[in-house]
């Protein structure tokens, strides 16, 4: 004899399912180009899975997004393992990529947050100098700066100094002493074009803390110095999602993990350059990238 499901119970269940499907997945990002690209990548991928998306791209920095995620104001964004380790967990440990990923994954799990598969690149901090200066001073690694630091002007983004992986800790690790340090506006910290304009005519700084995925580095013929003392941890990019969101939309596990390994370093540099260097629209750049992946 077939089971009878009470009409009211069935109706209530259908309403609940419909509500879950109609509730948009809130995708956020930090306010710099690479993050907007990655946020848009999440958004378009989720939309293609048949879910509605509400974009909050450029919402705020790491701590703003972390607080919003834990409070349920957003559902997902792309974070970097080394940033989570230093800024969120206040952990100064070092290790290979797998150790750092496991550390942040386990710590976030206690807050009901899930780290998905890394996207395929490590966006590490980098000490960047003009190519011609690197050749003239014969510097290839950060420790080579010791003999020249007193003559150089360092450009440091505001907010970088207080991190466990920040400026002061960096100076101590390398024993460097710069007599002139200029702070860069926070917006320029993540805007490769603005930061590296400092290397144009009448440059105000001689080196800057940049990102290894900045498209401007190659196009402006700048040089990244080797972090020969391994000061900076790895910064693998990966989506972080509320587990409540995954329970509501279980298909997101495969959808987001499917992005794992699809954005290697050379690709993210190209995408960053298309937006920062060529002025292309973020959404259009992501659509073209996804089309090429199919």
Region annotations inferred by a language model:
Residues 42-49, 143-180, 288-292:
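Ligand-binding cleft/hinge of the Venus flytrap
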Residues 55-67, 158, 179-195:
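Short helix-initiation/N-cap motifs at beta->coil->alpha
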Residues 58-62, 72-85, 100-101, 202-215, ...:
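Beta->alpha turn/N-cap motifs
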Residues 99-154, 243, 261-265:
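A conserved helix-loop-strand patch within extracytoplasmic ligand-binding domains
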Residues 161, 165-176, 250-294:
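An extracytoplasmic/periplasmic, membrane-proximal ligand-sensing/linker region
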């Amino acid at each position: 004899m077939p089971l009878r499901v009470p009409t009211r119970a069935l109706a209530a269940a259908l309403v609940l399912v419909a509500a879950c499907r109609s509730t948009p997945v809130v995708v956020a990002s930090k306010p710099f180009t690479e993050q907007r690209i990655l946020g848009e990548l999440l958004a378009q991928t989720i939309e293609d899975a048949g879910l509605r998306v509400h974009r909050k791209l450029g919402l705020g920095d790491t701590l703003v997004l972390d607080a919003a995620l834990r409070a349920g104001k957003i559902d997902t964004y792309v974070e970097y393992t080394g940033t989570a380790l230093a800024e969120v967990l206040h952990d100064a440990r070092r290790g290979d990529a797998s150790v750092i990923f496991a550390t942040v994954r386990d710590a976030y799990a206690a807050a009901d947050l899930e780290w998905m598969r890394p996207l395929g690149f490590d966006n590490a901090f980098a000490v960047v100098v003009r190519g011609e200066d690197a050749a003239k001073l014969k510097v290839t690694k950060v420790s080579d700066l010791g003999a020249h630091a007193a003559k150089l002007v360092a450009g440091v983004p505001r907010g970088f100094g207080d991190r466990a992986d920040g400026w002061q800790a960096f100076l101590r690790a390398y024993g460097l002493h710069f007599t002139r340090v200029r702070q860069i506006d926070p917006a320029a910290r993540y805007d490769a074009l603005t930061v590296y304009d400092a290397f144009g005519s009448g440059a105000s700084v001689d080196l800057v803390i940049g990102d290894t995925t900045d498209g401007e580095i190659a196009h402006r013929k700048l040089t990244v110095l080797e972090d020969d003392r391994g000061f900076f941890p790895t910064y693998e990019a990966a989506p972080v999602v509320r587990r409540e969101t995954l329970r509501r939309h279980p298909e997101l596990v495969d959808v987001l993990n499917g992005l794992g390994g699809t954005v290697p370093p050379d690709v993210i540099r190209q995408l960053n350059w298309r937006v920062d260097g060529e002025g292309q629209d973020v959404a259009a750049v992501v659509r073209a990238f996804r089309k090429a992946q199919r």
